[in-house]
């Protein structure tokens, strides 16, 4: 069977957030770990990594899903979106560290093209790290707030968006935006499941609307936790974060009493459905 066939057996796990560090040995180790876990991963690939990853994806499409890590402020961003699409990548991102707020009109043509191509998008939301504090940088976490996605989600209803880090620390806003925007999903990678480990029950207050019947909440929604998709945010080749993230997610879902069907959706089912729908709409191709 063609490994890119959207009708193939779904993997148990889909990690929507793995950064490539440029090292082909990392790719080999990642593939081995994913296959052992019956998992797939969305591999965030920068333009300089394009040729290397494109070749690798062709050989390992059973466990790797390409995401083009395009810079929103790159003058050549639209061309890179086309190149990633033509090469069989299924998504874009992680969009981050932009010179303007995410919802600035200058980025509209990029989001419009992504929606036309049905490319899944991953946005960094919330606080952003500062690895070199002595180096000046035009970066502001305020431009990356999860609330900046609201206008994008409404303007481009066909654009599937994953908000990485669930807006850390704006969790209430992130959950409420996901409640009203069917094209928004949330990932809990990063520090969130570390700092909340003493009482994961707090997530029940964020995802409060399961089974609620009210004119003040959308009708027909499944378990509110179904807005989550699994993510590890592996970067700098730190593959151990995959297993640590799995354990944190499973523990949180257990503490919150999330049912088995919803857990399966979070850990892989939802992401695989989105990818399969995207491929089916493209005639079985990326």
Residue ranges of model-derived segments:
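Conserved, mostly hydrophobic/aromatic
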Residues: 17, 34, 84, 92, ...
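Acidic (Asp/Glu)-rich catalytic clusters
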Residues: 5-9, 29-36, 51-65, 79-88, ...
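Histidine/acidic-residue-rich catalytic or RNA/ligand-binding cores of hydrolases
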Residues: 24-28, 53, 131-135, 171-180, ...
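His/Asp/Glu-enriched short active-site or ligand-binding loop at hydrolase and phosphoryl-transfer sites
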Residues: 185-199
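Charged helix-capping and loop-helix junction motifs
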Residues: 103-112, 138-147, 200-213, 245
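Active-site gating/metal-coordination segments in enzymes
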Residues: 48-143, 192-193
């Amino acid at each position: 069977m063609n490994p890119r066939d959207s009708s193939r057996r779904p993997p148990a796990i889909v990690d929507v957030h793995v950064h490539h560090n440029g090292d082909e040995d990392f790719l080999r180790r990642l593939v081995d770990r994913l296959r052992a876990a019956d998992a797939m991963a969305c591999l965030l690939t920068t333009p300089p990594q394009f040729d290397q990853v494109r070749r690798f994806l062709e050989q390992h499409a059973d466990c790797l899903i390409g995401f083009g890590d395009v810079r929103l402020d790159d003058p050549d961003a639209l061309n890179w979106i086309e190149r990633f699409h033509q090469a069989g990548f299924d998504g874009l991102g992680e969009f981050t560290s932009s010179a303007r707020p995410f919802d600035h009109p200058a980025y509209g043509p990029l989001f419009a093209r992504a929606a036309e191509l049905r490319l899944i998008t991953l946005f960094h939301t919330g606080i952003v790290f500062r690895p070199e504090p002595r180096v000046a940088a035009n970066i502001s976490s305020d431009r990356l707030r999860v609330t900046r996605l609201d206008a994008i989600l409404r303007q481009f209803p066909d654009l599937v968006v994953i908000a990485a880090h669930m807006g850390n620390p704006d969790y209430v806003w992130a959950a409420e935006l996901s409640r009203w925007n069917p094209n928004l999903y949330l990932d809990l990678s990063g520090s969130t499941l570390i700092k909340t480990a003493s009482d994961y029950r707090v997530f029940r207050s964020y995802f409060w609307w399961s089974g609620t019947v009210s004119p003040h909440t959308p009708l027909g929604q499944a378990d509110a936790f179904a807005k989550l998709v699994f993510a590890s945010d592996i970067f700098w080749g730190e593959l151990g974060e995959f297993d640590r993230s799995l354990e944190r997610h499973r523990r949180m879902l257990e503490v919150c009493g999330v049912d088995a069907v919803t857990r399966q959706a979070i850990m892989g089912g939802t992401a695989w459905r989105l990818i399969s729908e995207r491929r089916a709409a493209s005639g079985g191709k990326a």
